[in-house]
Amino acid sequence: MSRIGRKPVPIPQNVQVEIKDGNCVSVKGPLGQIEKTFSPLLTIKKVDNQIVVERPNDEKFVKALHGLTRALINNMVLGVTQGFEKRLELQGTGYRARVQGNKLVLEVGFSHPVELEIPTGLTVSVQDNTKISVKGIDKELVGQFAAIVRSVRPAEPYKGKGIRYEGEKIRQKAGKAGKK
């Protein structure tokens, strides 16, 4: 059995879980509500105060799906109780960010500012013009938007200028040797 899939997902007291049509799971908590539809190959049940994911056989694909589904449901429960956050930092002279309405405006060395539409369900805040915080209840959406922001100007390996995740280490390269 999948070691992750075998573990039941505990449901906290302030969270309501509803399973519709056998494979559509709706989780409602203090921070909001998430609904996801999973593969019909698996059986999702609510037993006592836990969600149990079961699989019909031991095929490789079904085993992988088993662990994935359990992890996604666990992330849904964590999202509506604690929420998720990704932090990014801008490094480079004149690099700055700001939130304008429902857009994140990045000035990262291009001839024009880059505007990114903030998806519904996410809150983006900027501290000191160089630190961006992306928060939300859907882990996938938070990570995807943070990756889109980072892809605008990924940190380069020579000077380290660009957008990076907080705490991310950029491997520095030596420049050209030069003439002697």
Curated annotation (Swiss-Prot):
SUPFAM superfamilies reported in the protein's UniProt record: Ribosomal protein L6 (SSF56053)
A GO cellular-component term linked to this record: cytosolic large ribosomal subunit
Name the record gives this protein: Large ribosomal subunit protein uL6
Gene Ontology terms describing biological process: cytoplasmic translation
Classification lineage: Bacteria, Pseudomonadati, Dictyoglomota, Dictyoglomia, Dictyoglomales
Top-level taxon in the UniProt lineage: Bacteria
Record key words, sorted: Ribonucleoprotein, Ribosomal protein, RNA-binding, rRNA-binding
Gene3D superfamilies registered for this protein in UniProt: Ribosomal protein L6, alpha-beta domain
Family to which the UniProt record says this protein belongs: Belongs to the universal ribosomal protein uL6 family.
Entries under InterPro entries matching the protein: Ribosomal_uL6-like (IPR000702), Ribosomal_uL6-like_a/b-dom_sf (IPR036789), Ribosomal_uL6_a/b-dom (IPR020040), Ribosomal_uL6_bac-type (IPR019906)
Molecular function GO terms recorded: rRNA binding; structural constituent of ribosome
HAMAP family, sorted: Ribosomal_uL6_B (MF_01365_B)
Organism of this sequence: Dictyoglomus turgidum (strain DSM 6724 / Z-1310)
NCBIfam families on file: L6_bact
Subunit structure: Part of the 50S ribosomal subunit.
Function: This protein binds to the 23S rRNA, and is important in its secondary structure. It is located near the subunit interface in the base of the L7/L12 stalk, and near the tRNA binding site of the peptidyltransferase center.
The keyword Secreted appears for this protein: no
